[in-house]
């Protein structure tokens, strides 16, 4: 791996931090490599969901967004699974990925498009109705979809009359002493200089090769900041990764370009502020940001019923967070964790805490040498072998230590 950083909390206080390796890599000129540091920022993937959940819950506290109401009331158009036209899709179901919405090949649309392009048969983004599960009723099945959080971004814009990224910076990040951003072009020059990249080991043809040099997969700007208010679409298909100006974007029509469920660039230090907020039950350094009930709602998976009204097993996914139950340490302890993790463009990041305690941790790793689909990279328990290795090591360090 190019670099890795961790921060550990015990009883609500930081007890350990370490940062090793490089945040940027220049294979041709290694003297230009930049070190991995506490304040180095990375695109943290699904960890971003925690902050979008913070935002949605804060809007609910202010009476601007009801999480159990039909989201069509906030989106400005009807959003129904065609197989269940009489069943509402709610904000809560967007947050916990039980909406029955599905990702297609493209999850981030250009600014000139609207999210309606995903749902209109005449649109090239409709993909023959791929954005709806055909045999699942809303609220009954979990499947992760970036589209859920893209629509939450739209709702945030329509209810606040501010751009998604700007509202989150002014009303969430500022309260936590965070200078993170979804738009690398809008960092100050000083903060942009701290931006790290995600790397993959691929050959010149783009094939995975663990003996090849590190290749930039995301945010490999090589020190050159993009033009202000511009953003590259965060789709895995390179043909759909063009860079666009945000200046003419229409508020409340397409927040997918920010990737509200994946596109946040934030440092380990700043993630530790979010962990402090969660461990403090909604307070950060003496200031109340969210309610205690908000934090409880985030960690609580839904209790679900089938079509006959019979209770089925609860999902592990709450609002922007999910549970990892029964994680084993080297000494045989069984640890229950809750949080979120990202694994995208070579970057692995996570923010977790131990249920029922004020212990938690953060990690960021910025490169992988083999394909995520390689059997060596897949974990039967976590789905991600790197996540398993990192979390098991941290869990043993935090909770097996005498």
Report residues per predicted region:
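Beta-propeller and closely related beta-sheet repeat lectin domains
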Residues: 42, 140, 262, 349-350
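Short, gly/Ser/Thr-rich active-site loops of penicillin-recognizing serine hydrolases
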Residues: 280, 299-308, 312, 326, ...
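Short, surface-exposed loop or secondary-structure junction motifs
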Residues: 24, 83-335
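Short, conserved catalytic-motif segment at the N-terminal edge
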Residues: 1-42, 131
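Structural recognition of the beta-strand scaffold that forms the well-ordered cores
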Residues: 5-8, 16, 43, 93-96, ...
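Short, well-ordered beta-strand elements
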Residues: 337-340, 348-375
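Active-site SXXK
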Residues: 6, 12, 43-71, 149-157, ...
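Short, glycine/proline-biased beta-turn/loop segments that scaffold the active-site neighborhood
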Residues: 67-83, 174-176
